[in-house]
Design a protein with these regions (language model features):
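Transmembrane beta-strand segments that form the barrel wall of outer-membrane beta-barrel proteins
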Residues: 258-268, 279, 290-301, 309-311, ...
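Periplasmic polypeptide-binding modules associated with outer-membrane biogenesis and secretion
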Residues: 54-268, 280, 298-307, 466
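Membrane-embedded beta-strand positions of outer-membrane beta-barrel proteins
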Residues: 262, 281, 293-297, 324-328, ...
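Transmembrane beta-barrel wall of Gram-negative outer-membrane proteins
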Residues: 304-405
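Outer-membrane beta-barrel "beta-signal"
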Residues: 281, 558, 584-596
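Residues that define the transmembrane beta-barrel architecture of outer-membrane proteins
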Residues: 245, 273-277, 305-309, 347-351, ...
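Repeated loop/turn-to-beta-strand initiation elements of outer-membrane beta-barrel proteins
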Residues: 233, 258-260, 287-293, 319-325, ...
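C-terminal outer-membrane beta-barrel translocator/porin domains of Gram-negative envelope proteins
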Residues: 379-523, 528-531, 535-537, 581
Length: 596
C-alpha cells in the first residue's frame, strides 16, 4: 500500500528519461563498432588484393628472362654463318702428252740451268732433277721436269706462273729451263663506281704489286671488292699481247642501291607475341662512300607488348677490308598474358661502336677480328614502381675463323672476351635495384661458338653446332647465357632458361631437293635434336644452381622464288615443360619472309 501511495508522476518521468538516455548511448556505441568493423574489413580487403598483386620471385625471374627488353637484342641477333664455301675442283686426270720423237733424243745430262725464278732457290729445284744428273736421259724427261716446276708454282698458289723448255742446242750436257712468273699488268673496271675511286685504285695497286701473282692475293682483293655494300664483281683474265707473262684483269661491277626484307613468324611468347612482324631496309653507298645504312623494326600483333627498333652505319676505313660500324637500338615492352596484372613495363637503349678487320679473306678460309664498345641502359617497372635499372659499359674483343677442310666440311670457330667497366655513369656493382641483386657490372666473361656443316652425299648434309659461355662473376640479366628460341632449345621460348655459365649444342640432318618449278625453287627437309644447360654462381629463386632442357623436331625450309622463303617445323619439348604453356606438348613454328 505504501508502494502505491509513494507513486508520483515526477518520478516516473525521470525514470523514463534515464531509460531513453541508456538506449541512445547503446546505439551510439553499436554504430562505432560497425564503423570500425567496416574499416577493418576494407583494410583487410586492400591488403589482401595488394598481396595478391605482388609478383613472386619466380614471376620476376621469368620477366627478366623472357619479357624484359634487355634480352630482345639477343633474341633478334642474327646467327653468324661461315663465309667459306666448297669450291668444286675437277681432278687433273690429263697428263701432258709429248711427241714420241722426243724419246729418241738422248744425251748425258751434266748440268741443268733454271732461269727466271725469284721465288725458289737452286736447292728447291735440284731435288726435281738430282736423280738424272750424270745419266743419259731423253728430251721427254726434260719436259717432265719443266712440268714439275710448273706444278710446284701452281701448288704454292702462283696460278699464272709456268716453266718452259726454250729452243736450244744441247752442248756438253747442259739443259736450260725458263720460268715465266706471271703477273697482272693492267686492271680495267667496267660498270658504275658508286664509291670513291681511290679505294678501288688501292685494290688495283695491291694486285699489280703481287709479282708473281698469288691466288690468295687475287682472291682476297676480289672478295674485298665484292664485300663492298651493294657491289657484286666478276673478273676476266686475258693474256697480254705485248709482255711475256703479263695478264690483263677486267673487273665487271654490278651495283644494288638498297636491300629490304619483310617477314612474319610466331617465335614470340605469350608475354610478347607470339606473332612477330619484322621489316628492314638498308641503303648502299647513298653518300658515295661505299657505306651501308640500315634500319630494322620488330613488333608483335599487339604492339604494346613488344617494340624493337635498331639502326646501323657501316663504313670501310682501309683498302685491306677494315670497317667501322656504329649501331643503336631501342626497345620497350609491356608484357601481356599472366604478367599483365603486374603492370610490367620495360625499356632498353643500346649503342655500339665496332672495328672489324679480315686478316684472312678467301673462298676457303677466313679469319676476322674485332674490338667493340657497348653502352646499354635498361630499366623495368613493376606495378608502376621502378624494379630494376642496369647501365652497362662493355668492351669486347673477338675473333672468328672459318675454313673448308679436305673432308668436305665447312667449319666455324669463334671466341669472344667481354669486360664490363664502372665508367660513364654505369650502375656499379652493389647498387640497388639491379636486375640481379648480386650481379656485377664490372664482370669478365668468355664465350664462343663452333659449327660444322658436313657433306655426307650430294644432297645430304649434317649440321653440328655448339655455343658456350663462362663467367668469372655473377652477371646481370642482359649478359646471361640463354637457352631456348630459334637456335638452341627450339621447342622452348626464347631464353627459357638463363644462367651465368651455359652450354648448348644441336645436331641437324638435312636433305635437299630441287624441284626447279616456277613457283617452287627448292626445299630442304630436316630433323634435329638440341640440348642446353645453364649454371648460376648463386641459387635462383627456386633454390637451384642449374637447369637443363632438350628438344627434338622436324621441319621443312623452302624457297618459293628468289625473293620469298620460309620454314615450318614441329618441335617437341623432352625433359622440361614450357613455362608459359605449363606442358610438354608439341609445338608448331613457322616463318615467312621476303627479301628484295
Amino acid at each position: 500500500m505504501r508502494v502505491i501511495l509513494n507513486f508520483r508522476p515526477q518520478n516516473a518521468v525521470k525514470r523514463w528519461e534515464r531509460c531513453m538516455n541508456l538506449d541512445w548511448a547503446d546505439n551510439q556505441s553499436y554504430s562505432e563498432i560497425l564503423l570500425i568493423g567496416f574499416l577493418v574489413c576494407l583494410w583487410w580487403s586492400f591488403m589482401t588484393s595488394l598481396s595478391y598483386a605482388q609478383i613472386t620471385p619466380q614471376g620476376r625471374d621469368q620477366t627478366y628472362k623472357q619479357a624484359a627488353p634487355d634480352r630482345f637484342e639477343e633474341r633478334f641477333k642474327k646467327q653468324e654463318f661461315p663465309k667459306s664455301q666448297l669450291v668444286p675442283v675437277k681432278p687433273d686426270n690429263l697428263k701432258p702428252v709429248f711427241p714420241a720423237e722426243m724419246r729418241k733424243v738422248n744425251f748425258l745430262l751434266q748440268r741443268m740451268v733454271i732461269k727466271g725464278s725469284t721465288i725458289y732457290g737452286k736447292r728447291q729445284f735440284s731435288r726435281l732433277f738430282r736423280e738424272y744428273l750424270h745419266k743419259r736421259i731423253n728430251l721427254e724427261q726434260v719436259y717432265i721436269i719443266a712440268q714439275e716446276i710448273t706444278n710446284m708454282y701452281r701448288n704454292d698458289g702462283y696460278i699464272l706462273s709456268k716453266a718452259v723448255v726454250p729452243p736450244q742446242k744441247i752442248e756438253e750436257g747442259v739443259v736450260q729451263i725458263d720460268v715465266i712468273e706471271g703477273f697482272i699488268d693492267r686492271v680495267a673496271i667496267q660498270g658504275q663506281v658508286r664509291g670513291p675511286r681511290q679505294l678501288l685504285n688501292e685494290y688495283r695497286k695491291a694486285l699489280l704489286k703481287s709479282r708473281p701473282l698469288k691466288a690468295l692475293d687475287l682472291e682476297r682483293y676480289l672478295l674485298l671488292v665484292d664485300d663492298l655494300p651493294g657491289v657484286s664483281v666478276k673478273s676476266v683474265l686475258t693474256p697480254s699481247k705485248f709482255k711475256q707473262g703479263a695478264t690483263n684483269l677486267t673487273l665487271i661491277l654490278d651495283n644494288k642501291s638498297y636491300d629490304g626484307s619483310f617477314g612474319v613468324d610466331n617465335r614470340g611468347t605469350k608475354f610478347n607475341g607470339p606473332i612477330q612482324i619484322n621489316a628492314g631496309m638498308s641503303g648502299n653507298a647513298l653518300f658515295k662512300n661505299y657505306e651501308r645504312i640500315g634500319l630494322q623494326g620488330v613488333v608483335t600483333s599487339n604492339t604494346d607488348e613488344l617494340r624493337f627498333f635498331s639502326g646501323f652505319y657501316e663504313q670501310p676505313v682501309s683498302s685491306e677490308g677494315t670497317k667501322l660500324f656504329f649501331s643503336g637500338s631501342f626497345s620497350d615492352s609491356e608484357p601481356g598474358s599472366t604478367l599483365k596484372d603486374f603492370e610490367v613495363a620495360g625499356e632498353s637503349k643500346t649503342f655500339t661502336i665496332r672495328l672489324t678487320h679480315p686478316f684472312i679473306r678467301s673462298r676457303s678460309e677466313n679469319l676476322n677480328g674485332f674490338v667493340s664498345y657497348t653502352n646499354r641502359d635498361t630499366e623495368t617497372l613493376i606495378l608502376g614502381e621502378l624494379d630494376s635499372e642496369d647501365r652497362l659499359r662493355i668492351v669486347n674483343l673477338g675473333v672468328s675463323y672459318d675454313f673448308v677442310d679436305k673432308y668436305k666440311g665447312i667449319n666455324l670457330v669463334s671466341f669472344n672476351l667481354s669486360k664490363g667497366f664502372d665508367i660513364f655513369d654505369s650502375t656499379e656493382t652493389g647498387s640497388e635495384q639491379l636486375t640481379r641483386s648480386s650481379g656485377h657490372s664490372d664482370f669478365t666473361k668468355v664465350s664462343g661458338e663452333a659449327l660444322r656443316l658436313q657433306q655426307l652425299a650430294p644432297s645430304w648434309m649434317l649440321l653440328g653446332a655448339l655455343s658456350w659461355q663462362y663467367s668469372f662473376e655473377k652477371l646481370l640479366a642482359s649478359e646471361e647465357f640463354g637457352v631456348g628460341g630459334a637456335q638452341y632449345g627450339r621447342a622452348y621460348d626464347s631464353s627459357e632458361i638463363t644462367g651465368d655459365q651455359g652450354l648448348a649444342f644441336k645436331l641437324e640432318l638435312q636433305k635437299a631437293f630441287q624441284p626447279n618449278k616456277k613457283y617452287f625453287k627448292d626445299l630442304q627437309l630436316y630433323t634435329f635434336f638440341d640440348y642446353g644447360k645453364v649454371w648460376n654462381r648463386l641459387p635462383t629463386s627456386t633454390g637451384s644452381t642449374g637447369e637443363n632442357l632438350s628438344s627434338l623436331g622436324l621441319g621443312i625450309r623452302f624457297n618459293v622464288t628468289d625473293v620469298i622463303s620460309g620454314y615450318m617445323e614441329w618441335d617437341k619439348p623432352l625433359n622440361q615443360e614450357v613455362s608459359s604453356e605449363g606442358n610438354k606438348d608439341g609445338r608448331v613454328f613457322f616463318s615467312l619472309s621476303a627479301r628484295f
